[in-house]
Amino acid sequence: EEVLAGNIKELVLVNCCDTIRSVYDILKDSGQMDFLYMIDMLHCDIECSRERTAAQLKELAETYGAYKEKSFDKKVFLEAFQPKERIQKPHLAVLGARMGQELFQMTEAAMPLPVVNETCVYNRSVGENLPTEEMDFDTLMEWYAGELLHQIPCMRMMDHAGRKVLYQDPSLKGIIYHTVKFCDFYSFEYADIKGHTDVPLLKIESDFTLQSSGQLSTRLEAFAESLGIQDETKKEKVMGKGYYAGIDSGSTSTDVVILDKNREIISSVIMPTGAGAANGAERALEEALKQAKLNREDLDAVVTTGYGRTAISDGDKSITEITCHARGAHFLDPRVRTVVDIG
């Protein structure tokens, strides 16, 4: 789309699947490109693969140099390599197929720890042995070919055992595993990781758009809650009399339940939400307190959930319906392992 809109005139494609080959053919036939080149992605790190990749890199440099009427600049090439700093403190990682920037930002915003993007194309980096100025052009391309093929392998490589380093990090506290519709490579890895890691694991799927952003956001928030990492910006705790209120703020109705310290329901109210989730929640809570013959000061905590939970600033904690449903089902019957639907 960017090319056909005239925003890109020079493009190097990596031949990793049928889709890229089709894109290459379409762009070539369009006649809109000033420079178009496709380089093969080889699937193994052996001597003949390195030789083939080095030959392609040399041809690319020569072809592009002829197009730009410039020669290869070794100084600029060497300056392009910057050491990658890997995070050492507790963090979460996004693994799997490439994730769009908007979805990754949504993931970062929902999580209580730093999030590292380790999906396809984002975990690319060469080794620690960087090239030197003494290397000539041919030697540099041979070095570069070896480094490209010796990176953390993607799932298209014949030997992808090296990917285990992505989820065997001792500072890793959770994994969000992303797959793209109709890209089957990474679903196999998810099944393998699921059986070989003890850290919390969430699988999400997208079509590289934000079409299902609402559902994805709710699942990400529920996963964040399941990690059990407390928010350091909690409100000051005020002790009441052992009563707790739960507010479920829906688009149509607002439900309030008050429990005592023995987890017994002492009052419950269902009222129309009306104009504004916060106002509806306040009215319903006041009615529930009235039925229970309690004052607001008697409550130890107020927890909000549902469609309008983020609009209710009066609550002590806000959690997703997914978490509420899961914990509620487990409380009613601890044998439950799968929830099909509640609500």
What is each stretch, according to the model?
Residues 106, 257-259, 281, 311-316:
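Short acidic, glycine/serine/threonine-rich loops at helix termini
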Residues 8-12, 91-92, 299-300, 314-316, ...:
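Short active-site oxyanion
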Residues 1-244, 262-264, 274:
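An N-terminal assembly and electron-transfer interface module characteristic of large anaerobic redox
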Residues 244-248, 300-303, 337-340:
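Short glycine-aspartate micro-motif
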Residues 97, 247-252, 307, 342-343:
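A short acidic Gly-Thr/Ser loop motif
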Residues 235-239, 307-343:
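Conserved phosphate-binding catalytic cores of ATP/NTP-utilizing and phosphoryl-transfer enzymes
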Residues 247-279, 287:
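Short glycine-rich, Thr/Ser-proximal phosphate-binding strand/loop in the N-terminal lobe
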